[in-house]
Amino acid sequence: MAKGTPSFGKRNKTKTHVRCRRCGRRAYHVRKGYCAACGFGRSRRIRRYSWQNKKVNRKRRR
């Protein structure tokens, strides 16, 4: 099995991020089990910093 560039082509088979239940963004990491945008699954508090300009979008699409 080769390592390096040929192996990177096999990384696109599974979805890394799916839609988050709390913030609605496609930032919930399936294998890690938490959202990169709002921190759902890692903490009860919404991930928020003073240097960021994000709004929490709780509307669900169906």
Curated annotation (Swiss-Prot):
Gene3D superfamilies: 2.20.25.30
Superkingdom of source: Archaea
GO cellular component, as recorded: cytosolic large ribosomal subunit
Pfam families: Ribosomal_L37e
Binding site for Zn(2+): 20, 23, 35, 38
Cofactor: binding comment: Binds 1 zinc ion per subunit.
Record InterPro entries: Ribosomal_eL37, Ribosomal_eL37/eL43, Ribosomal_eL37_CS, Ribosomal_zn-bd
Similarity field: Belongs to the eukaryotic ribosomal protein eL37 family.
Zn finger (C4-type) start-end: 20-38
Function: Binds to the 23S rRNA.
GO annotation, biological process: translation
Protein name: Large ribosomal subunit protein eL37
Organism: Methanopyrus kandleri (strain AV19 / DSM 6324 / JCM 9639 / NBRC 100938)
Cofactor(s) required for function per UniProt: Zn(2+)
Gene: rpl37e
Alphabetized UniProt keyword annotations: Metal-binding, Ribonucleoprotein, Ribosomal protein, RNA-binding, rRNA-binding, Zinc, Zinc-finger
Gene Ontology MF terms: rRNA binding; structural constituent of ribosome; zinc ion binding
PANTHER family (alphabetical): 60S RIBOSOMAL PROTEIN L37 (PTHR10768), RIBOSOMAL PROTEIN L37 (PTHR10768:SF0)
